[in-house]
Curated annotation (Swiss-Prot):
One of its GO terms (biological process) is regulation of transcription by RNA polymerase II. A zinc finger (C2H2-type) spans 170-192, 198-220, 226-248, 254-276, 282-304, 310-332, 338-360, 366-388, 394-416, 422-444, 450-472, 478-500, 506-528. Its main location: nucleus. SUPFAM superfamilies: beta-beta-alpha zinc fingers, KRAB domain (Kruppel-associated box). InterPro entries: KRAB, KRAB_dom_sf, Znf_C2H2_sf, Znf_C2H2_type. This is Zinc finger protein 82 homolog. There is a cross-link at K126, K142 (Glycyl lysine isopeptide (Lys-Gly) (interchain with G-Cter in SUMO2)). GO terms for molecular function: DNA-binding transcription factor activity, RNA polymerase II-specific; RNA polymerase II cis-regulatory region sequence-specific DNA binding; zinc ion binding.
Length: 532
């Protein structure tokens, strides 16, 4: 059987600096994994070579193309000599140049690494009759001719089609997820073991991969190499810049087939799809609670351990994640870099601006499938949906009263402790919530910023305007499931439901008579001459 050597570059991928910058983070990590795995395979097959510079750089999280340029300056003659030379000592044997880095394929071709089968290879450190090049710079591997033919046949198809040829032989025993490259499995397995071998010397934060540590260290150094030519905003890594640039062109190429929502990044779509599937792959080993995103699990674990890594040097407030600290720090600096072009209002966070702009555009992309009502924010739809389901996940441990919103629970709990920390400087009235104080202060200044376009009536609160507008539209979104009677207000529905249930939660302490509505109790107390 004739043996044919296959070049290392035949199953490797290479990019120019410009091409490298257009790879996203996931693709760069995959590239790094494939190259390290290929090198590991060659070593295990008996290729006695010193570690190439590019492999050392990849292990350290460095950019590979920098090493490529350096290597070509050092050995230009060797590379020219051995790049295309065909040896005729045996039938069709070619020299393998492990540091050649010839640009052959795009990232979609990474799956060809799976064609390397250990049993099919024989290694040789020297071709008979050839003077051995510089130590560690070249090596060759022989492969049966039929395997080379198989390789050549597969390279004749499109890059996308090649992905379907490649299996995923490396399977995680914990969750069953499979990978094309062993190194990917190694990285993935650290999610289950919690192993984070790469530690930041500045803050002690640890990471599973060196590339992640490298990006993190730029937070400390303030290094932002990638600047947007449109708006001048700078980023730590190129992937963040490319995602940002899609905002300017409005590109959202990744669309959810379930609901049609589109995303700029494939990873965002993957996370979003778990809402539809209900998948929560990340489980807390302490309490068993599951999460859709690993970042959510990490934050949850920090809450349990009271481990708060990010502390504000101005006020000492601590945060679970660095992004929270960065947003908070803008409070001290007064920085609000994101300005609305319609009204000039500025925001500390880009997402706040995006949500605000929907006020001007009228965009409400989130629709309730039960009643057809639409919302500008996904969270508002979630809260609204609880009206239909009756879900009240937040329970007071003092009186066991349940609430559909966490903010309602917090507000309610202050009743038990009697705390009203927010005082009005005008009249001295105290409130449990800052939002209540803000609403109250508009009474003193006479501000009513929310005006009805139908009749011109103005309101202090947007919520009041929304309720008022239902008078003009005739909308009654809150329906009783018992008798199908509909109401404009949720509070009216709650009161109505007590007719069916017989519930009378408001009791007179004087005579023990009970009432369905608080206003009825107030009116009744006048009989006893009780001051309210």
């Amino acid at each position: 059987m004739a043996l044919r050597s296959v070049m290392f570059s035949d199953v490797s991928i290479d990019f120019s600096p410009e091409e490298w910058e257009y790879l996203d983070l996931e693709q760069k990590d995959l590239y790094r994994d494939v190259m390290l795995e290929n090198y590991s395979n060659l070593v295990s097959l008996g290729c006695f070579i010193s570690k190439p510079d590019v492999i050392s750089s990849l292990e350290q999280g460095k950019e590979p193309w920098k090493v490529v340029r350096k290597g070509r300056r050092q050995y230009p003659d060797l590379e020219t000599k051995y790049e295309t030379k065909k040896l005729s000592l045996e039938n069709d044997i070619y020299e393998i140049n492990l540091s050649q880095w010839k640009i052959m394929e795009r990232i979609e071709n990474h799956g060809l690494k799976g064609l390397i089968l250990k049993n099919d290879w024989e290694s040789t450190g020297k071709i008979e009759g050839q003077e051995r090049p510089q130590e560690g710079y070249f090596s060759s591997v022989k492969m049966p001719s039929e395997k080379v033919s198989s390789y050549q046949k597969r390279t004749s198809v499109t890059p996308h089609q090649r992905l379907h040829f490649v299996d995923k032989p490396y399977e995680c025993k914990e969750c069953g997820k499979a990978f094309r490259v062993r190194q990917q499995l190694t990285f993935h397995h650290r999610i289950h073991t919690g192993e984070k071998p790469y530690e930041c010397k500045e803050c002690g934060m640890a990471f599973r991969q060196t590339a992640h540590l490298t990006r993190h260290q730029r937070l400390h150094s303030g290094e932002k190499l990638y600047e947007c030519k449109e708006c001048g905003e700078a980023f730590i890594c190129g992937a963040d810049l490319r995602v940002h640039q899609k905002m300017h062109i409005g590109e959202k190429p990744y669309e959810c087939k379930e609901c049609g929502k589109a995303f700029r990044v494939r990873g965002q779509l993957t996370l979003h799809q778990r809402i539809h599937t209900g998948e929560k792959p990340y489980v807390c080993k302490e309490c068993g609670k599951a999460f859709r995103q690993y970042a959510h699990l990490t934050r949850h674990q920090k809450l349990n351990s009271a481990d708060r890594l990010y502390e504000c040097k101005e006020c000492g407030k601590a945060f679970l994640c660095g992004s929270g600290l960065r947003v908070h720090h803008k409070l001290h600096t007064g920085e609000k870099p994101y300005e609305c072009k319609e009204c000039g209002k500025a925001f500390r966070v880009r997402q706040q601006l995006t949500l605000h702009q929907r006020i001007h555009t009228g965009e409400k992309p989130y629709e309730c499938k039960e009643c057809g009502k639409t919302f500008s924010r996904g969270y508002h739809l979630i809260l609204h949906h609880r009206i239909h389901t009756g879900e009240k996940p937040y329970e007071c441990k003092e009186c066991w009263k349940a609430f559909s919103r966490y903010s309602q629970l917090i507000s309610h709990q202050s009743i038990h402790i009697g705390v009203k920390p927010y005082d009005c400087k005008e009249c001295g009235k105290a409130f449990r919530l800052l939002s209540q104080l803000t609403q109250h202060q508009s009474i003193h200044i006479g501000e009513k910023p929310y005006k009805c376009k139908e009749c011109g009536k103005a309101f202090r609160l947007r919520q009041k305007l929304t309720l008022h507008q239902s008078i003009h539209t005739g909308e009654k979104p809150f329906e009783c499931k018992e008798c199908r009677k509909a109401f404009r207000l949720n509070s009216s529905l709650i009161q109505h439901l007590r007719i069916h249930s017989g519930e009378k939660p408001y009791e007179c302490k004087e005579c023990k008579k009970a009432f369905r509505q608080h206003s009825h109790l107030t009116h009744h107390l006048k009989i006893h001459n009780v001051k309210i």
